[in-house]
Regions:
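Short alpha-helical transmembrane segments in multi-pass integral membrane proteins
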Residues: 1-17, 71-137, 183-241, 297-362, ...
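Short runs within selected transmembrane alpha-helices of multi-pass transporters and secretion channels
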Residues: 64, 132-150, 158-166, 191-207, ...
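Transmembrane alpha-helix boundary/anchor motif
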Residues: 30, 66, 103-107, 116, ...
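N-terminal transmembrane alpha-helices
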Residues: 2-33, 37-38, 54-66, 70, ...
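Transmembrane alpha-helix boundary and packing residues in multipass membrane permease domains
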Residues: 17, 21, 32-33, 69, ...
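Helix-terminus/linker motif at the lipid-water interface of multi-pass membrane proteins
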Residues: 22, 26-44, 112-119, 175-188, ...
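Small-residue-rich hydrophobic transmembrane alpha-helices
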Residues: 43-106, 139-158, 258, 271-335, ...
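Transmembrane helical elements of multi-pass membrane transporters/channels
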Residues: 12-31, 131, 142, 165, ...
Length: 439
């Protein structure tokens, strides 16, 4: 029997993370709407650049997740000064990763004209790309502070900062895209500058809170007294790279599935995009709660409390299942109307309706893999996660998508039927590994 205290603690920790994640989705919707209303060309250019940067930011966020189990374990042991020292090393590691990714993205920028994009969009893409590139290092440094705060169970500070940052971003969009309050009308470039500004502001605000808050006093002491050291730096890389690769592979597999959908034509691609937008909503909610599982598990792991580790992960999965049912029920009931919210095209609306059932089937697997990949992160057992992700997404899911979609000729529905196979197999393998490690 799992004590109700586990559910209460997870909700208290997880809901602020979920709210922060939902804020990111709302910002994505707002960006798309505001750029789209300014110009169709701007929207097309933003679509390409944002897709490239989303993959990089997901990879970068995954790397920063290596900090959570270290901080959570030290916090569980009551070693607050060591937490501050670890944060110093995490800022160093994340900063270097930011520089590495920036250099990589500069290489891509130099070859952007070779990527087969419409010539007329390149003058819009280039400045927007560069402005987002400048924001990459602030994102990495903010992520280090966020994972530190999550690890010491302070999930509310990052939540309020993300809400504030998103609000500033939307206001900045309104001012700079359309040219309000005396500013010139900058279109897509304005959206990029608004994003960069909000990312710098929330980073500087978090630094100010860390340096001035009484709550962080003991961690600040550890931060100032602690030294950059090789063991902490190597441990952060040892935990960060596998999580980054796991999250990157999951995202890449969905991107490759999108390429297969493109072979079926524009209508299939439009229906796929609608469902991916809806799917992201569920995924972000699950991942927010699963991040709380990682924190709780790491706290109990630091105390060598195996029962607490297992009960926390089970309670997290139960809460995510409740979320999945909450998401799936209205979608099932409204499956014939959903497509019409996004488009007037009757064919696309019918296709969207046909994808709801495979979407609902994979919610169980998505919840399972979110929970137990994060539970494994909590006990710092991350290397197998990378191998499992490769097997599930590249050996099982993508070939199944091709088989169902094109060999069996089930089309778009066939490609979507491969997602439950990939996500559920990943979830089961993560769960089995977690059970083995927590006997």
């Amino acid at each position: 029997m799992i004590a109700s205290s586990h559910y209460k603690a997870l909700l208290k920790l997880g809901l602020p993370i979920v709210i922060g994640q939902l804020g990111m989705i709302i910002l994505g919707f707002a960006d798309t709407l505001m750029i789209g209303h300014h110009s169709t060309e701007g929207l097309a250019a933003a679509s390409f650049v944002n897709n490239v940067f989303n993959l990089v930011i997901i990879f970068a966020t995954g790397f920063s997740y290596g900090l959570t189990p270290i901080v959570g374990s030290l916090f569980g042991k009551g070693e607050q000064k060591a937490v501050g020292c670890t944060l110093k090393n995490a800022l160093w590691a994340n900063g270097l990763m930011g520089i590495f990714l920036t250099a990589l993205m500069m290489l891509l920028y130099a070859n952007i004209h070779r990527l087969g994009q419409p010539e007329e969009l390149l003058p819009l893409m280039r400045p927007y790309y560069l402005v987002l590139l400048v924001s990459l290092i602030p994102v990495m440094l903010f992520n280090a502070f966020k994972q530190f705060a999550d690890g010491i169970t302070d999930t509310q500070t990052p939540m309020w900062l993300l809400i504030g940052g998103n609000t500033l971003n939307i206001i900045g969009n309104w001012v700079l895209i359309y040219g309000h309050l005396g500013f010139p009308e900058m279109g897509l470039l304005g959206a990029g500058i608004a994003t960069l500004s909000s990312r710098i502001i929330i980073l500087l605000t978090f630094i100010g809170i860390f340096l001035g808050s009484k709550r962080y006093h003991i961690y600040r002491t550890g931060f100032l007294q602690g030294k950059l050291n090789k063991p902490d730096f190597l441990q952060l890389n040892k935990l960060g790279w596998p999580v980054a690769l796991q999250m990157g592979m999951e995202t890449a597999s969905f991107s490759l599935a999108t390429i297969m959908v493109g072979w079926l034509g524009a209508m299939a691609l439009a229906a796929h995009q609608v469902m991916m937008t809806i799917g992201q909503l569920g995924y972000m909610m699950y991942y927010g709660m699963a991040a709380a599982v990682a924190v709780r598990v790491s706290n109990f792991h630091g105390q060598h409390d195996t029962e607490g580790v297992r009960h926390s992960s089970s309670a997290g999965f139960h809460l995510i299942l409740v979320m999945a049912v909450t998401v799936a029920t209205p979608l099932l009931l409204l499956r014939h109307q959903i497509g019409g919210w996004f488009t007037d095209n009757a064919e696309v609306t019918l296709m969207v309706a046909s994808l709801i059932v495979p979407f609902i089937i994979y919610q169980f697997g998505d919840g399972l893999q979110c929970t137990y990949s994060n539970a494994l992160r909590g006990i710092a057992d991350v290397k197998p996660v990378m191998y499992i992700a490769f097997i599930a997404y590249f050996i099982i899911s993508l070939p199944a998508g091709y088989l169902f979609g094109f060999v069996f000729d089930w089309g778009l529905t066939g490609i979507w039927l491969s997602f439950p196979f990939g996500l559920t197999s990943a979830g089961l393998m993560f769960w089995l590994r977690f059970r083995q490690q927590t006997k």
